[in-house]
């Protein structure tokens, strides 16, 4: 179990988790607020 915890704390695993979280956050923001760069007044 100690080796598994060490594996989870390595940089590639943390980077993958962070990028997945960021991608999911961006997808959800774009789902609720589509095209925030285009505002028609």
Swiss-Prot record:
Keyword Transmembrane helix part of the UniProt annotation: yes
Example GO BP: photosynthesis
Transmembrane region(s): 7-27
Compartments it resides in: Plastid, Chloroplast thylakoid membrane
Gene3D superfamilies, per database record: Single helix bin
Record Pfam families: PSI_PsaJ
SUPFAM superfamilies: Subunit IX of photosystem I reaction centre, PsaJ (SSF81544)
InterPro entries named in the record: PSI_PsaJ, PSI_PsaJ_sf
UniProt function note: May help in the organization of the PsaE and PsaF subunits.
PANTHER family assigned to the protein according to its UniProt record, in alphabetical order: PHOTOSYSTEM I REACTION CENTER SUBUNIT IX, PTHR36082
Protein family: Belongs to the PsaJ family.
The protein's name: Photosystem I reaction center subunit IX
Gene designation per UniProt: psaJ
């Amino acid at each position: 179990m100690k080796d598994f915890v060490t594996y989870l704390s390595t940089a590639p695993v943390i980077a993958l988790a962070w990028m997945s979280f960021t991608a999911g956050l961006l997808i959800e923001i774009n789902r609720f607020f589509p095209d925030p760069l285009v505002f028609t007044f």
